Amino acid sequence: MLLYPAPLPGEVCVNMTNVIGIDGTSVRDLTRAEIVCREQMVRIIRFLREFVPGYENCYAVTSASNVGVRETRHFKALYELTEFDIVEAKLFDDWIATRNLFNFDIHSLKGPGLDEHGAQHKFRSKGKYSIPFRCCIPQKLDGLLLSGRNIDGTHKAHSNFRVMPICLNIGQGVGT
């Protein structure tokens, strides 16, 4: 369970719902995920009220407008960013996003929790890394640049560059 302070006194942000086995490109699966996560929210509030001191009267103020899907499709670009590029803190000649630093946040595909292989502990970056422009140029489409989570990268690399600060960095670089 992740609890983050909110701007208003007495409020916190909770990040805890999880659903697996969905296809993020399927409307039916996304609907099922919405239902599962909303049911989880009710149970989470009940748990907080019963077991966490200070949360006896807690309630949901708001929630995301739709379920967040961690990963779906990736384009094939001129270069595929790998976890080894990140671990080695590679600085590419054609970088468009640099000074990126985040942990590997691989969630299990089999159930709640982090990756059962412990990738988040095995892969430690030597420092800040860059993302090459080539990751943003699709192999088979003209007139399109990729930005954010859909750039070309391995599953493990994606667990690192998918976070908002790095996606914003990529977007700024591609759009400039």
Regions found by a protein language model. Give the residues of each.
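Flavin (FAD/FMN)-binding glycine-rich loop and adjacent Rossmann-like elements that form
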Residues: 1-176
